[in-house]
Amino acid sequence: MVGHLHLQAMGDTREQSRDGLLDSPDSGLPPSPSPSPPFYALSPGTLDTRTTTEAPAAPSLFQTPPALEMRSRLLPVFFGESIEVDPEPAHEIRCNSEITYASERYFRDKIFYAPVPTVTAYSETIVAAPNCTWRSYRSQLTLEPRPRALRFGSTAIIFPKLARSSFRTTLHCSLGQPRHWYSSSLQLRRCGDPTPGPSCPDVL
């Protein structure tokens, strides 16, 4: 009996064995090319680049943190302001009245003073609390009494020895600058009638 036997797997086995014979060192032929891509040698610079591009290592837990920069902040705690008022310098009030006659002179001057409050000092204090918008203000005004002439009176008693027909009175008031002066004049004339009349004053 004559027949044919078909072995499908035999062809593949034969090809594999043929490739194996070609790749074996006993065949005397050079090795077949590898299906893997060719290997190219990397330069040292390329290796360094690849090394540096690797993921950075996780920071150590025991690494000391950088010192925090501490800056002190200046906040207003107390603020004071004072204003000093320099009043006018003290004036010496002198009121002199002088009457000059050809005879004796006699003077009686009266000056009345009264304390008048005058601003002598002024101060203001502002207190600011830190980290707060609260403010405290305090103002102080100092008043001190200073004498001031309110009324001036002068009386002159005359004992004439040599009677004259005209008299003049001058009053000088020195209240600082400028000075003030006042003058008054009195003129007398003889009366034939000894009885007092409207034209003859009985009291000087």
Swiss-Prot record:
Disruption phenotype: No visible phenotype; probably due to redundancy with RFLNB. RFLNA and RFLNB double mutant mice exhibit severe skeletal malformations, as characterized by scoliosis, kyphosis, intervertebral disks defects, vertebral fusion in the spine and longitudinal bone growth retardation. Chondrocyte maturation is accelerated in double mutant mice.
Tissue: Detected in various tissues, with highest expression in lung, followed by spleen.
Biological process terms in GO annotation: actin filament bundle organization; negative regulation of bone mineralization involved in bone maturation; negative regulation of chondrocyte development; skeletal system morphogenesis
Bias (Basic and acidic residues) ranges: 12-21
Induction record: Up-regulated during chondrocyte differentiation.
Highest taxon of source: Eukaryota
Region (Disordered) location: 1-52
Compartment annotation: Cytoplasm, Cytoskeleton
Residue numbers of Asymmetric dimethylarginine PTMs: 151
Pfam families: FAM101
InterPro entries in alphabetical order: Refilin (IPR028215)
Residue stretches of biased makeup (Pro residues): 28-38
Cellular component GO terms, alphabetical: actin filament bundle; cytoplasm
GO molecular function: filamin binding
Keywords assigned by UniProt, alphabetized: Cytoplasm, Cytoskeleton, Methylation
Entry similarity comment: Belongs to the Refilin family.
Job description of the protein: Involved in the regulation of the perinuclear actin network and nuclear shape through interaction with filamins. Plays an essential role in the formation of cartilaginous skeletal elements.
Subunit structure: Interacts with FLNA and FLNB.
UniProt name for this protein: Refilin-A
Gene that encodes it: Rflna
